[in-house]
Design a protein with these regions (language model features):
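Condensing-enzyme catalytic core mediating Claisen C-C bond formation in acyl metabolism
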Residues: 4-35, 83-97, 130-136, 141, ...
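A glycine-biased, small/acidic residue-tolerant capping/turn segment at secondary-structure junctions
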Residues: 71-84, 126-132
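A short beta-alpha structural unit
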Residues: 8-13, 50-59, 99-100
């Protein structure tokens, strides 16, 4: 497995003190993912990312995150879920291993577990969860509060 890019974005909470932020997105996710896409040469995330592991501490967080990652059009994430696009046989499988709500939320270790799942997938070792053709995986992790947090994005692929 090869790390194609890794980005961090930190928020000091200033966006929550202005009326310009309505709480429907996470600025750090948008910043970190766009930087990662740019550096990894990804122009069409929805078509190029083939699997994701995201910080799904709450159901709404996963939905908002998929929009912030440009894997769903803003305001249309629920349609993508209902259409099955994030299912294991969908266009962009998400949380193939069940995510945080399945594994629990080991604070400090959540990101490592996500990367491990992408490692298993890219090396064909995920057993019954194995995707047919994983090419690029995206890992998204958060820490903090919606208005004041740090976001980590990793894009991984096979070692060429």
């Amino acid at each position: 497995m090869c790390i194609r890019d890794r980005q961090l974005a930190v928020s000091n909470g200033t966006e929550s003190s202005h009326e310009s932020w309505d709480g429907s997105y996470l600025k750090t996710t948008r910043i970190a993912s766009q930087r990662a896409y740019d550096e990894a040469g990804i122009r069409r995330p929805k078509e190029e990312i083939t699997m994701t592991e995201v910080h799904d501490c709450f159901s709404i967080t996963e939905l908002v995150t998929m929009e912030d990652l440009q894997l769903a059009e803003e305001g249309k994430g629920v349609n993508e879920v209902l259409d099955g696009n994030f299912d294991s046989d969908g266009k962009t499988p998400c949380q193939i291993d069940g995510g945080l709500k399945c594994f629990g939320h080991p604070i400090g270790a959540s990101g490592l577990r996500m990367i491990y799942e992408n490692y298993l997938q890219l090396n064909g070792r995920a057993g019954a969860r194995q995707l047919s053709e994983p090419k690029l995986g995206l890992n998204h992790n958060l820490g903090g509060f919606p208005h004041q947090n740090i976001c980590s994005i990793s894009i991984v692929g096979p070692y060429n």
